[in-house]
């Protein structure tokens, strides 16, 4: 039953079912041992606004204490503040954030960083075997921690980094989605004396106003309505549940992560940029005119790894994860990205006009295909083989860095396996909507043939 909680990038499951006293105490104990074995002397632990956070914190801390590692409680804070705690202040050796990110309210999980490296992939799978061995251990409640105020340190750091924004006479909206963002946004806005209309700042684990995923159009309706009703507000920002993602929107446009990446790149000298495999052709074509750009795998852990390997200044996912190494520490931080977006406005960048000036491309929404967990990677491999054999007309090139991204010259198609769920994910982009739909039809016809063969 616990197999499902150990994902590619983190640990995630239903509170009370997969994430219960027995499993979380065992996770804490095994994590403490792993951290000690990697030379860590301490760990910071924080959590988001979910109703299950306190109980999971107690279970996790009890396990960590049994392992014998020093624990610092950084409280209810966004995930980026957990990462930040490894770089500033006491500069902790490891961090665990208890967060369900953008998932429904009954979910929760753990994002783990050890010695500034994401704990994921093969290591996390091997770790799961250790957890199984200790599921029946008698781990007593031990809540011994030392409190640490990372929030004040973070706000002070941001105020110093963005001191030029103080008293900036520009009105904008912010939707904190009743997640963890509000605990930072409110003191930050106050300290910089910014003219912001802040919505849903109160942390509420029930997410009473809307779900904590700003990439879903329905979750932007409240902040969009505010923009439309107030002529002197032209831009707004929305965060996900743990504020490692940010979406910007105007009265007429939602800026996706790849569009934001392009805008940010224009403000970096000779930039080295990384875009995930789902990013628009515009990002790769346009950045190549003034910088260097790479394509990489989806997933925050994969991106952080490649950023180090390629000395990347800035990376992005379409979903709103923005990673700044330029003037920052190289992890995804929605609040930092929000401040960098305000910086663009402060410098006179017209964000909407800059995006409108790009070549017009038509992108389909992400389509998920439900498949068996055991078959998903095999199906993608078979699809890649068929492309290599010439199964589709007009193929210019095939990129297999993460699934199959097929370039047709006037558009591209993507089929990749989700690393976290039993789905294949598709995306299509072309110079016309008709062509994008045509590519979609071609890919689905081929995939249906492959899937039928698997059943026989």
Predicted regions, residues:
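Glycine-rich phosphate-binding loop
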Residues: 92-105, 227-254, 294, 300-333
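An N-terminal, well-structured beta->alpha segment
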Residues: 1-67, 144-170
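Short glycine-rich phosphate-binding loop at a beta-alpha junction
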Residues: 40-48, 171-173, 272-277, 313
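Phosphate-binding and adjacent anionic-ligand microenvironments
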Residues: 270-427, 433-456
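Gly/Ser/Thr-enriched, mixed-charge loops and adjacent short helices
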Residues: 108-229
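N-terminal small/polar loop signature for handling phosphorylated ligands or for N-terminal nucleophile
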Residues: 42-107, 188-248
């Amino acid at each position: 039953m616990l197999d499902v909680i150990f994902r590619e990038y983190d640990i995630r499951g239903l509170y009370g079912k997969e994430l219960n006293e027995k499993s979380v105490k065992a996770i804490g104990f095994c994590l403490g041992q792993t951290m000690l074995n990697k030379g860590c002397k301490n760990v910071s632990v924080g959590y988001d606004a979910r109703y299950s956070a306190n109980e999971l914190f107690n279970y996790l801390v009890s396990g960590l204490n049994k392992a014998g590692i020093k624990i610092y409680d950084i409280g209810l804070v966004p995930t980026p503040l957990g990462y930040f705690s490894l770089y500033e202040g006491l500069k902790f050796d490891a961090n665990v954030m208890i967060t369900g990110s953008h998932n429904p309210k009954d979910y929760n999980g753990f994002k783990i960083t050890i010695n500034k490296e994401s704990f994921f992939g093969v290591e996390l799978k091997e770790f799961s075997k250790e957890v199984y061995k200790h599921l029946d251990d008698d781990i007593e409640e031990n809540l011994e921690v030392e409190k640490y105020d990372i929030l004040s340190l973070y706000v002070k750091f941001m105020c110093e980094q963005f001191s030029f924004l103080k008293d900036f006479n520009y009105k904008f909206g912010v939707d904190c989605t009743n997640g963890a963002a509000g605990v930072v946004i409110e003191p930050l806005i106050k300290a910089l004396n910014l003219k912001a209309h802040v919505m849903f700042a109160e942390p509420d684990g029930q997410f009473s106003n809307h779900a904590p995923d700003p990439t879903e159009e329905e979750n932007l309706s409240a902040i969009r309505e505010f923009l439309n009703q107030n002529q002197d507000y032209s831009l707004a920002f929305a965060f996900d549940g743990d504020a490692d993602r940010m979406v910007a929107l105007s009265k007429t446009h939602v800026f996706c992560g790849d569009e934001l990446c392009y805008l940010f790149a224009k403000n970096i000298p000779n930039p080295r940029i990384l875009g995930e495999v789902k990013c628009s052709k515009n990002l790769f074509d346009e950045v190549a005119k003034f910088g260097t750009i790479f394509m990489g795998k989806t997933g925050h852990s994969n991106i952080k790894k490649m950023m180090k390997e390629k000395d990347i200044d800035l990376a992005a996912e379409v979903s709103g994860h923005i990673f700044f190494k330029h003037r920052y520490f190289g992890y995804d931080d929605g609040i930092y990205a929000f401040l960098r977006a305000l910086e663009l406005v402060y410098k006179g960048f017209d964000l909407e006009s800059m995006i409108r000036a790009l070549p017009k491309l038509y992108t389909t929404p992400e389509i998920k295909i439900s498949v068996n967990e055991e078959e998903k990677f095999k199906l993608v491999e078979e699809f890649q083989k068929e492309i290599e054999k010439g199964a589709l007309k007009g193929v210019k090139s095939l990129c297999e860095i993460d699934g199959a991204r097929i370039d047709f010259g006037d558009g591209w198609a993507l089929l990749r396996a989700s690393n976290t769920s039993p789905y294949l994910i598709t995306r299509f982009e072309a110079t016309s909507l008709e062509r994008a739909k045509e590519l979609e039809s071609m890919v689905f016809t081929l995939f249906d043939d492959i899937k039928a063969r698997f059943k026989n």
